[in-house]
């Protein structure tokens, strides 16, 4: 959850303690791209296997305010996604979604304009179309996504658009040119993400040194063009970070995130405490199964309570791989609580 994309101020968000305020929902593992750095395609479970309408009803009753139709595949491959979004809107839920942009078009975007869409993440990994398409292994993707960004701003002008940008060996030297894409199409935020679990695309020492030298320039350029970084701090290499994504700065992280969020994997029906735990050991991090339990039973169940306590006490090693957004949420929460 990125606080900059949430309408409610932190104080109001924190009043939802022990309610699933923000829910990540992965509809399937199917994708029209074949990204170089993605491990989702190795998963055996593919299509949605739970009743999404029933789930939306349960989440609404439990106090959910936001549903993020997220990755794990491309959400717009699912033929029913617009029906799900329509139902979320009727239930008063806010919607955020992630997409590579390939399956969107003007007709679908016009339809999206009638739903409670608050923010959209698009994935773009280079200011050059050929590099982006080669990393995503989907020819023509760059042209489609950039065109659809402008269409969304035309038909849903108040929506916040964030660009997920996986920093890697192929694009980190051109980060300034990527920021300048703001001059070509309309978006609000850049969300640079350091690549992990892909040694062949991890940075050289020289690239890291060069990035650090240009850090002030990146901030100045973004400010000049009216762009924000979703997480204010993009000084990724200040603390030691490995090609596996381990961050030594997180060793003492106390996590309250599962008291506000959860991740639901529709192909398996498995429920996890957050979006960072879905590829961890299921024996530790899985808190329920919607094929056997209701969402209320999962949320109020003993597994979530036990895991929540361990995370709050900083007992689990997932903290070293925690995404920056989730870290910032925790820092903000404990600062607010004093």
Language model features: what each stretch is:
Residues 1-119, 201, 207-211:
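Conserved alpha-helical substructure of the radical SAM core
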Residues 1-44, 57-61, 242-250, 259-260, ...:
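N-terminal pre-core extensions flanking Radical SAM catalytic domains
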Residues 26, 47-50, 94, 114-267, ...:
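Radical SAM enzyme [4Fe-4S]-AdoMet core and its adjacent flexible, acidic
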Residues 58-61, 87-90, 151, 181-184, ...:
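Residues within well-ordered alpha-helical secondary structure of globular protein domains
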Residues 105-106, 175, 300-301:
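Polar helix-capping/helix-linker motif
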Residues 263-266, 282, 326-337:
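Extracellular/mature segments of secreted proteins
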């Amino acid at each position: 959850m990125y606080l900059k994309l949430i309408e409610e101020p932190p104080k109001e968000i924190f009043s939802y303690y022990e309610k699933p305020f923000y829910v990540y929902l992965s509809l399937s593992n199917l994708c029209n791209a074949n990204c170089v750095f993605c491990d989702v395609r190795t998963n055996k479970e593919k299509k949605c296997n739970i009743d999404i309408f029933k789930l939306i009803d349960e989440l609404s009753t439990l106090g959910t305010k936001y549903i993020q139709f997220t990755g794990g595949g491309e959400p717009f491959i699912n033929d029913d996604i617009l029906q799900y979004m329509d139902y979320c809107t009727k239930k008063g839920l806010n919607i955020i979604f992630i997409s590579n942009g390939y399956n969107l078009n003007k007709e679908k975007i016009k339809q999206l304009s009638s739903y409670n869409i608050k923010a959209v993440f698009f994935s773009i990994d280079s200011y050059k179309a050929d590099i982006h398409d080669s990393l995503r292994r989907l020819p023509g993707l760059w042209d489609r996504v950039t065109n659809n960004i402008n269409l969304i701003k035309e038909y849903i002008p108040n929506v916040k658009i964030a660009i997920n940008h996986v920093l890697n060996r192929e694009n980190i030297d051109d980060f300034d040119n990527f920021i300048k894409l703001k001059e070509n199409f309309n978006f609000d935020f850049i969300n640079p993400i350091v690549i992990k679990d892909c040694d062949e695309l991890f940075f050289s020492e020289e690239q890291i040194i060069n990035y650090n030298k240009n850090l002030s320039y990146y901030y100045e350029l973004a400010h000049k063009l009216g762009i924000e970084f979703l997480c204010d701090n993009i000084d990724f290499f200040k603390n030691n970070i490995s090609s596996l994504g381990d961050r030594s700065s997180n060793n003492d992280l106390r996590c309250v995130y599962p008291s506000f969020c959860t991740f639901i994997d529709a192909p398996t029906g498995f429920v996890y405490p957050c979006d960072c735990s879905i590829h961890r050991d299921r024996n530790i991090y899985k808190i329920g199964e919607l094929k056997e339990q209701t969402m209320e039973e999962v949320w109020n169940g003993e597994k979530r309570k036990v895991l929540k306590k361990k995370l709050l006490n900083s007992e689990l090693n997932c903290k070293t791989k925690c995404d920056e957004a989730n870290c910032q949420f925790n820092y903000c929460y404990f600062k607010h609580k004093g």
